[in-house]
Amino acid sequence: MDNPLNLIPAIPGEDWQAGKITAVLPRGLYRVRLDDGREVTTHRAGAVRLSHARLAPSTPVWVVLAVNDPARGRIVARRQ
């Protein structure tokens, strides 16, 4: 899904994936299970980091996967 919330300008080719946090890891990392079943390691980015949003297991989030490593990504927003 391409930038569903229009929070920040989408980078061409950037694909937002829906997922749910399954674990909070050390050093500000999170394990997220995407809706297609994949597990990725992510970190908070952008507005989520600046707002100090509390992210706990089972929180629904939007994730952008890294281009070079599809097993890593960044959390760009919380889902409603």
Stretches found by the model and what they are:
Residues G19-I21, I75:
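Conserved hydrophobic positions within beta-strands
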Residues M1-Q17, R78:
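Short boundary/loop segments of OB/S1/cold-shock single-stranded nucleic-acid-binding domains
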Residues R38-G46:
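A short macromolecule-binding patch
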Residues V67-Q80:
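OB-fold/S1-family single-stranded nucleic acid-binding modules
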Residues P26-V32:
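Short aromatic-glycine-enriched beta-strand elements
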Residues V48-W62:
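Short nucleic-acid-contacting surface segments enriched for D/E, G, S/T with interspersed K/R
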Residues K20, Y30, S51-H52:
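Short, conserved secondary-structure segments in the cores of folded domains
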